[in-house]
C-alpha cells in the first residue's frame, strides 16, 4: 500500500475551502444568517451549535455569517454558550476563535404561532450587517406540531427580499402517508422544492456517501451487482442502549418510524438504484424514487417485531426493560426492534430479499450494509466454503471489507474465511472525517440537495410502510420479548434464514488495526 502523506487539519480544511469557492453556489463575500429555530432544545445544544462552530473554526463558512437563535425561552447568548460549549470539543488554543464565534451569535425570544414575535426576529436580522439583503437559512429544530405555524410565519415575515432563503426540516416528516402529505403540501405551498432541505443525517455519513463511489466508480462491482450474483442484502442498525428514561418520546413513533422508514430505506435506495445520469442532485434523487416505486407495501408475514426486557444478569440500565422506563405508557406494545423483508420488483433485483433490521438494547453498536453473494457453482471443497460478503461498515470504525475464502496456511488444502479490508482510520490516518451534520449543513450553504430527501421520495417511503404501521396500531400487535444485550428475537434470525440469508456464526470481523 502506498504510504500516505500526513495532512494537518489546516491543510485538509484548506483543500476543502479551495473546492468550495471554485463553484458559483458558494459566494464567500455574501452575508449569510443562520437561524436556529428551537435554539434552547437538545438538538440545537448537542448537534447544531457544535456543527456551526466546527465549520466556523475550520474556515468553511462564508466570512460574513451570523448565527441567530430563536426559541420561547428567555435566554441570552451566554446561556446558549453554557449549554452547548461542552459539546464543542474546543482546545485552549482555540479560545480566541471561540470568542469570535460567539461574537457573531445573537438570540431572540418569541412564540412560534405569534406573527409579532417573528416581526421582532425579522427586525433583529435586518439590524445585522447587510442583514436585509443577506441569504437566510432557517433550521427547524422543532417538534413537527409547530412546523405549520413556524413556516407560515417565516414565509410571511422573515424572508430575505434580495438573498436566497432555505429551510431545513428535521425528521420525523409526519407519522404516516396522510400526515406526511399534509405537512409536505403545507410546506410546498410556501416554499419551492429547491428551498426545502429535509434532513436525514444518515445521508451525511461518510460510508453512506461512499456507496455511490463504490458502486459506480469500480469496474469490478458493476457486472456482479444483480440478482444473478447477490443472494440477499442486509441493512443493520443496532444500538447497545435502551431509551435511557426518554421512552415517552420514542413511544410516539417506534423503531420503524425512528430508523427504518428513513435511515435504512435511504441506504437501500443507494444500493439498489440504477446509475444516475450525473451526480446532479435531481439525477440522483430521480433514481432513488424509481427504486422506491418498485417496492410493494410491506407484508405482515415478512415482519418480526420485538421489545426488550431487563437482563437479570445485567448491571445498571441493562436490568431494566422498555416498560420499566417511567416515561413509557403502561402496557405499551411499541416495538423497540424490527426486522422487515422488502423486494425490489425490477429486472436487476427480482427475487432478492432486502432485509432491514434495527433495534435498541442489543449486543453491540453497529450500522452496516452487507451484501451476501450466492454460493459458488460446482463446489470442489466438500462444502467448506462459506458465501462471500461485501460489508460497508457505517459505524463504528468506518470500513469496507470483503469476506472471502483463502487457503489456510499449512500442509493441507483447507479453505478458511478471511477478508480484504479497508478501514478508514488506518488508510486515512491524518484525515478528520467530518461529522454528518457538518457535511449536510455545508451542503445547504452551497445549495446542494443530493443528500436531502425530496417530497416524492418521502411519499413513496411512507407508502411502503403506512399499511403495516396502521395494521400494528389497529391490532395492537404484541412484540416478542428479547433480553437487553442480546441479538434480538430469535424469530428475526429465522425470518432471515427463511428468505435466504445464511448465517454460519463461524466468522466475525475483527478490526485488524485495533482502533
Curated annotation (Swiss-Prot):
NADP(+) 2 binds at residues 357, 366, 370, 393, 401-403, 421-423, 487, 503, 509. Its EC number is 1.1.1.49. It is found in: Cytoplasm, Cytosol; Membrane. The keyword Kinase does not apply. SUPFAM superfamilies: Glyceraldehyde-3-phosphate dehydrogenase-like, C-terminal domain, NAD(P)-binding Rossmann-fold domains. Keywords: Acetylation, Carbohydrate metabolism, Cytoplasm, Glucose metabolism, Hydroxylation, Membrane, NADP, Oxidoreductase, Phosphoprotein. Pathway: Carbohydrate degradation; pentose phosphate pathway; D-ribulose 5-phosphate from D-glucose 6-phosphate (oxidative stage): step 1/3. It catalyses: D-glucose 6-phosphate + NADP(+) = 6-phospho-D-glucono-1,5-lactone + NADPH + H(+). It comes from the Eukaryota. Belongs to the glucose-6-phosphate dehydrogenase family. This is Glucose-6-phosphate 1-dehydrogenase. The gene is G6PD.
Amino acid at each position: 500500500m502506498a504510504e500516505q502523506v500526513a495532512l494537518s487539519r489546516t491543510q485538509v480544511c484548506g483543500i476543502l475551502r479551495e473546492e468550495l469557492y471554485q463553484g458559483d453556489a458558494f459566494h464567500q463575500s455574501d452575508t449569510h444568517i443562520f437561524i436556529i429555530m428551537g435554539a434552547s432544545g437538545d438538538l440545537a445544544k448537542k448537534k447544531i451549535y457544535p456543527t456551526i462552530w466546527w465549520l466556523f473554526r475550520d474556515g468553511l463558512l462564508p466570512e460574513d455569517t451570523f448565527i441567530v437563535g430563536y426559541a420561547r425561552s428567555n435566554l441570552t447568548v451566554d446561556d446558549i454558550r453554557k449549554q452547548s460549549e461542552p459539546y464543542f470539543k474546543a482546545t485552549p488554543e482555540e479560545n480566541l476563535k471561540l470568542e469570535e464565534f460567539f461574537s457573531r451569535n445573537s438570540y431572540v425570544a418569541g412564540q412560534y404561532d405569534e406573527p409579532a414575535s417573528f416581526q421582532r426576529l425579522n427586525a433583529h436580522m435586518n439590524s445585522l450587517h447587510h442583514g436585509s439583503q443577506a441569504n437566510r437559512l432557517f433550521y427547524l429544530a422543532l417538534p413537527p406540531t409547530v412546523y405549520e405555524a413556524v413556516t407560515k410565519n417565516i414565509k410571511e415575515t422573515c424572508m430575505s427580499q434580495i438573498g436566497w432563503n432555505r429551510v431545513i426540516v428535521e425528521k420525523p416528516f409526519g407519522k404516516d402517508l396522510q400526515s406526511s402529505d399534509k405537512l409536505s403540501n403545507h410546506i410546498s405551498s410556501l416554499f419551492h422544492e429547491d428551498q426545502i432541505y429535509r434532513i436525514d443525517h444518515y445521508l451525511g455519513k461518510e460510508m453512506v456517501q461512499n456507496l455511490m463511489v463504490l458502486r459506480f466508480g469500480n469496474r469490478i462491482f458493476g457486472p456482479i451487482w444483480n440478482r444473478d450474483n447477490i443472494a440477499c442484502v442486509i441493512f443493520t442498525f443496532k444500538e447497545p442502549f435502551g431509551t435511557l428514561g426518554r421512552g415517552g418520546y420514542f413511544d410516539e413513533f417506534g423503531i420503524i418510524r425512528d430508523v427504518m422508514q428513513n435511515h435504512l430505506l435511504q441506504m437501500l435506495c443507494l444500493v439498489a438504484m440504477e446509475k444516475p445520469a450525473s451526480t446532479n442532485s435531481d439525477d440522483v434523487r430521480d433514481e432513488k424514487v424509481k427504486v422506491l416505486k418498485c417496492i410493494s407495501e410491506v407484508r405482515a408475514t415478512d415482519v418480526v417485531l420485538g421489545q426488550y426486557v431487563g437482563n437479570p444478569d445485567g448491571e445498571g440500565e441493562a436490568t431494566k426493560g422498555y416498560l420499566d422506563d417511567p416515561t413509557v405508557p403502561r402496557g405499551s406494545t411499541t416495538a423497540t426492534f424490527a426486522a422487515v423483508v422488502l423486494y425490489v420488483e425490477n429486472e436487476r433485483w427480482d427475487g432478492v430479499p432486502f432485509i432491514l433490521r434495527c433495534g435498541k438494547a442489543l449486543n453491540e453498536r453497529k450500522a452496516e450494509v452487507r451484501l451476501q453473494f450466492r454460493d459458488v457453482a460446482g463446489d470442489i471443497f466438500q462444502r467448506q466454503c462459506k458465501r462471500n460478503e461485501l460489508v460497508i461498515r457505517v459505524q463504528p470504525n468506518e470500513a469496507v471489507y470483503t469476506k472471502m475464502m483463502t487457503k489456510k496456511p499449512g500442509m493441507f488444502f483447507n479453505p478458511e474465511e478471511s477478508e480484504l479490508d479497508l478501514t478508514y482510520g488506518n488508510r486515512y490516518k491524518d484525515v478528520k472525517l467530518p461529522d454528518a451534520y457538518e457535511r449536510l449543513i455545508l451542503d445547504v450553504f452551497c445549495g446542494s440537495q443530493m443528500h436531502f430527501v425530496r417530497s416524492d421520495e418521502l411519499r413513496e417511503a411512507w407508502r411502503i410502510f403506512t399499511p403495516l404501521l396502521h395494521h400494528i396500531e389497529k391490532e395492537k400487535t404484541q412484540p416478542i420479548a428479547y433480553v437487553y444485550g442480546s441479538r434480538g428475537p430469535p424469530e428475526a434470525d429465522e425470518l432471515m434464514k427463511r428468505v435466504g440469508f445464511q448465517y454460519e456464526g463461524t466468522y466475525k470481523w475483527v478490526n485488524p488495526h485495533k482502533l
